């Protein structure tokens, strides 16, 4: 029997999954309310939206935008990966595929946000 434990990437993936589901649960209902109801029905002054866009160009705003875009994708890909396993759909190297897509998405979003 080996005394050294096997290394795993699961703690990192579960951290990103947990962050993604938390961000989705806390912020997305507010975004749907604002962008889906209040803004289209004219209940929000358009001047406030211009100020919000200005905030998103600041370093703190860019960080918030990264959090709102990246972490939910990690959560979704983790759910899809394990959901396919639960439905007995086994894809060779599915972890590499799904988490690799999340890494690619992360790089693309970082590039897009920091080029604003």
From Swiss-Prot:
GO molecular function annotation: succinate dehydrogenase activity
Cell membrane listed as a keyword: yes
Matches recorded under SUPFAM superfamilies: Fumarate reductase respiratory complex transmembrane subunits (SSF81343)
GO cellular component: a single term: plasma membrane
Organism superkingdom: Bacteria
Gene3D superfamilies listed in its UniProt record: Fumarate reductase/succinate dehydrogenase, transmembrane subunit
Residue ranges of coiled coil: none
UniProt keywords, alphabetically: Cell inner membrane, Cell membrane, Membrane, Transmembrane, Transmembrane helix
Location(s), subcellular: Cell inner membrane
Regions crossing the membrane: 24-44, 52-72, 96-116
GO biological process terms, semicolon-separated: fumarate metabolic process
Topology of this chain in the membrane: Multi-pass membrane protein
Subunit annotation: Part of an enzyme complex containing four subunits: a flavoprotein (FrdA), an iron-sulfur protein (FrdB), and two hydrophobic anchor proteins (FrdC and FrdD).
NCBIfam families hit by this protein: PRK05470.1-1 (NF003977)
Similarity remark: Belongs to the FrdD family.
HAMAP family xrefs: Fumarate_red_D (MF_00709)
Function as written in the Swiss-Prot or TrEMBL entry: Anchors the catalytic components of the fumarate reductase complex to the cell membrane, binds quinones.
Protein name (database record): Fumarate reductase subunit D
Organism: Pasteurella multocida (strain Pm70)
């Amino acid at each position: 029997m080996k005394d050294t434990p096997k290394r795993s990437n699961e703690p990192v993936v579960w951290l990103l999954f947990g962050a993604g589901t938390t961000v989705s649960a806390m912020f997305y209902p507010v975004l749907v309310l604002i962008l889906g109801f209040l803004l289209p029905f004219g209940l929000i002054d358009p001047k406030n939206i211009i100020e919000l866009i200005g905030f998103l160009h600041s370093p703190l705003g860019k960080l918030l935008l990264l959090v709102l875009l990246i972490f939910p994708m990690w959560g979704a890909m983790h759910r899809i990966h394990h959901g396919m396993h639960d439905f007995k759909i086994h894809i060779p190297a599915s972890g590499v595929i799904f988490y690799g897509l999340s890494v690619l998405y992360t790089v693309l979003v970082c590039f897009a946000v920091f080029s604003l």
